[in-house]
Amino acid sequence: MPKTVGVAVSNATFHFDKLYTYAVMPDQQDTVRLGSMVLVPFGRGSRARMGVVLACDAEPESAKLKFLFDVAPASACLTPELLRLVHFLKERTFCTYYEAVKAVIPYGAQYKPTVAEDGVTPVLQKQLVRHTENAYKLVGTLPPKPRPTAKQLAAVALLAGGERTLSALEEKGISRAVLDNLCAKGVLECSKVNKAIDLYSSIPLKNEPILLTEEQQAAYDALLPGLEDAAPHSALLYGVTGSGKTLVFLKLIEHCLQMGRRALVLVPEISLTPQMILRLKSQFGKRVAVQHSALNHTERLLQWQMIQDGGADIVVGTRSAIFSPLENIGLVIIDEEQEHTYRSESAPRYSAHEVARQRAAENGALLLLASATPSTESYYAAQHGRTQLVRLTKRYGGNPLPKVQIVDMRAELASGNPREISLAMEDAIRHNLEAGKQTILLLNRRGYQTVAQCEDCREVLKCPKCSVPMVYHKSAHKLLCHYCGSQLDPPPARCPACGGKLQYRGFGTQKAEEELAKLFPEARILRMDQDTTAAKDAHEKLLAKFARHEYDIMVGTQMVAKGLDFEDVTLVGVLGIDSLLFAQGFRAYETVFSLVTQVVGRSGRAKDPGFAIIQTTDPDNPVLNLAAAQDYDAFFEQEIAYRKLGLYPPFCGLCVVGFAGPKESEVARASARFAALLGRQAAKQPDLPLRVLGPTPGGIEKINDSYRYKLTVKCRNDRRFRNLIRETLTLYEQEKLPGKATVVVDLHSDGDI
C-alpha cells in the first residue's frame, strides 16, 4: 500500500526522462503497485499524461506532491520480468522509459486518457475494448414476400448450420444491416456472446507423432541437454533449405511442454506466420497465441490477455512477440535469424536477438537461432564456441538441392530480347506450366516502373519531400514515394525542370505481372507485395490459395523468398537482384546471399527436383555464384575476411548516431557539435577503444522534408561505451544551439539511419 510512487511519464525528452514522485490517494493505495499504468498531472499546467510506476514509496509524503489522477486496472500492470525489460531497453537502446513501455505493451492493450462524466476530471478509459459481440441464430422461416435478397438467402443458409457471430458472418459478406432486418422479420434472433479468443479455431488438431530423420534426430539429441538444463543456453541450428528445421522445432517444443514449460517462436515477417501457426496449432491445439501487427487492436488485446492469464503454452509472432507476458519460458526460437526485420528501426531501437537472450537468461531457457543462411555474427560466435553449433546438411526426404542457372541479361539484350524476362526463364516457366507445376518469381521492387527520367536534361523525377525517385504504380495511375507516401496524381508527362518529355523506365512487380500475363495468357498469376497484402489476413488468404493450386505463378518481393513450403513449386526465378548488390551498408552482400539462397530453396521441396534461374547483369559476381551453389561456408569465409579487413561486426560494435531536422545547415552544425562533445568525453578515457567516422550526410539525405546526417562509431558495445554515449547525449541536450536536430542512437544499424 504505497503512499508515494515514482512515475516515468510519457513524452519525456531524453534529458528529462527520470522518475517523478506523486502521492497516492487512499482509495488508490490497494490498486497501485510496481508496473501499474497511471494517469498523472504533469508540469505547471498539470496536464494529464500517461505514466508507469517504477518505484513505490519513492520519498516521504509532502504537501507539495501532486496526486495521481487515475490508476489502470491490475490486468494492465507489467509483470516483474517485463518491468526488468523496460529498464534493460532504456540502458541498451537510449530510449525513454515510456518508449520502452510502449514497445512492451501492444497498442491495443494501452489505456488512454479521457475525462470523467463531469467533463473536467482526467481519468483513464474504463474498458479497452468490448469483450462481447452480436451472435445470430435461425429461429424462423424467411417469408416469400417481399422477395428475399441474395444476401438474406445467404445469411439464412449459413445460419442453418448453427449460431454464428457477427464477425464470422461479415467475413462471408453479410452486413449487420441485413442481419438486423432479418431479426425484425422474426427470422433471426440476436444475442451477446464473448468474443472468441482462439483466432485459428478452424485448424484441426492432428496430434500426430513427430517423426524425425536420422540427421534430424541427431540434431534434436544434441539440443536436448540445453533444453533440459535449468541454466540458460544458446544454440545455432544451421540447416540447408528444405532440411526440416521446423520438425526439429516441433519436437523440441513438444518436450518443452512435457517439462511443464512454455515456448516462444519468432518469425521474421507476417507472411510467414500462417504456415507456422498451422504447424503449431495442428500439433498442439488451442493453447497457441499469436502476436503481430496485422491483428486488430481487439485481437491483439485478447491474445495478450490470454497469454497473461496463463492460457497459452506457445506464443508465435513477429519481432514484437518477444515482449509477450509469457512466464516459465523453457525455449525461445528465432527462425530465419539473419533477417533485418528482427531489428527495430524506431525507438526503442532494439534487436530481438538481444532481448531474447535476456529473456532466456531470466528464465533459464534454451535460445535457438535457426537459418539456412545464418548471420555472419551468429556463425562466427558458433565457430568460436560462444554458442552451440548444430548442422542439418541433407534435405528432408533425401531430395537434392535445386540446380541453378545464371542468365546474363546483357547478353540477352545484345541478342535482341529487350524484355525483363529472359528466354531461358520464359522456356522454363512454360515447361513448368505444361507439367502442372508452380513457379515462384522474386523481384525486389514493387510498383510498375521505378524511374521517370527526362529525355532532354536526364533529370530523374524525385519526391518533393525526399531525395529518392518516385515509382509509377499503373493500377492507381500515380507516382508514389515509397518512403513518405507522397504522390503525383496524375503522373506528369513533362519534366518539371525543363519541360522535356518524361520517359518511364524500370521494372516492378506490377509490370512483371503484366508481362507474365502477356507471355502466358492461360496462367493464373498471383502478385505478392505490399500493395496486394495491405488488407487484413491478405497474406494468409493469398498463400492458402496458392497452396490449393488456385494460382500457377507467384511473383513478389522479399516476402515470397523465405520460409514458404509448397510441394508443387519446382521452379524459382530471380528477376531482379542487382540493385541490392550495390546497396549501402556492410551487410549488403550477406543480404543478397541470404535472399537468393532462400528463394532458390523454395523449389523442389517434395518428390520432384527443383530448378532455379537467376537473372543478372553481373553473372561473374562471386556472391551470386556462391548463392547459386548454396555454398554458405565458402561465402562465410569470404565475408568474414572482408569484415575483419574493414573492422566491422563481429570484430567491433557499430553505433550510428543519426541527426534529422528541416534545415540542412542546422542538422550539419548539430552533428558536428555532437561529434566534438563525443571527442571531448572520449579523451577522458584514452584506453576506450573507439573509431569515429563523420559526420556525413545519410545514405538518403532527405526523407519527408527532414535532412539526415550520421556519425558512425566503431566501438566495443559494453556498458562503459554506452555510458559515454549517454553522457554525450546529456551534454548535447544542455547545449543552447540556435537550431537543434533530433538525435537517435542505433547500436544495431547496418551503417545508416
Residue ranges and their predicted role:
Residues 1-371, 383-399, 681, 719-726, ...:
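Accessory, non-ATPase domains that flank or precede helicase/AAA+ motor cores in DNA-metabolism machines
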Residues 2-4, 17, 46, 436, ...:
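A general secondary-structure signal for short beta-strands and their flanking turns/coil
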Residues 13, 520-523, 678-691, 735-740:
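Short secondary-structure junctions
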Residues 60-75, 696-698, 702-714:
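Solvent-exposed, membrane-proximal periplasmic/extracellular interface segments of envelope transport
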Residues 206-213, 217, 221, 230-668, ...:
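Inter-lobe coupling/hinge segments of SF2-like helicase ATPases
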Residues 672-674:
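Long hydrophobic segments that form regular secondary structure
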Residues 676, 680-703, 707, 743-753:
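A carboxyl-terminal module marker
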